[in-house]
Amino acid sequence: MKFFVDTADIKDIRELNDLGLLDGVTTNPSLILKSGGKIADVTKQICDIVQGPVSAEVVATEYKDMMAEAEVLAKIAPNVCIKVPLTLDGLKACKTIRTQMNRMVNVTLCFSANQALLAAKAGASFISPFVGRIDDTGSDGMELIQEIRQIYDNYDYQTEILTASVRTVNHVKQAALIGADVITAPPATLKALVNHPLTDKGLAAFLADWAKTGQKIG
């Protein structure tokens, strides 16, 4: 499974990348706003840190304008992945970006298996189902991941399932068990994956016993 971080915070991205955990980054207009920077500058900084795909989102809603914005974003760095919404214009833009620009495309705001099927047909590199937001409605977001996995396997679609709107470490575990290709999560969630009370307890016991030996290493 690939780990992407869902943030535009340069400090967090650099820290996780230095740990060797990052395969990519996802951003959106809300995260760019939170960063306080300009989209081109922030995206370039991220691309200089992370070698994997860095999703940068168009904000236009019509095909022609989406394509114009995609051209601008693509010039920032070779590893920019153009992010488009799951609309008819977004799907059309996805197809064009993939076939004519030969750039990665992340189709976002997916909430149904039918939408995911359309994105795969359009040649999307990634489909981003929002599991947390589905959970908020009282449904089970992971059921959607299961449905998409089965559909993509049925027809050997190469579109990668990028599990998004990840809120908990359990979301990560469930996505991995189902076979999602990628998860994108906030920095705090990725860091929380390492936590377990028995690990802490065991380490404390080992250190206490080691102190009693009076030894040093090196």
Curated annotation (Swiss-Prot):
Pfam families: TAL_FSA. Keywords: Cytoplasm, Pentose shunt, Schiff base, Transferase. Gene3D superfamilies: Aldolase class I. Pathway: Carbohydrate degradation; pentose phosphate pathway; D-glyceraldehyde 3-phosphate and beta-D-fructose 6-phosphate from D-ribose 5-phosphate and D-xylulose 5-phosphate (non-oxidative stage): step 2/3. It is found in: Cytoplasm. GO terms for biological process: carbohydrate metabolic process; pentose-phosphate shunt. Belongs to the transaldolase family. Type 3B subfamily. Transaldolase is important for the balance of metabolites in the pentose-phosphate pathway. NCBIfam families: fsa_talC_mipB. This is Probable transaldolase. It comes from Mesorhizobium japonicum (strain LMG 29417 / CECT 9101 / MAFF 303099). The gene is tal.
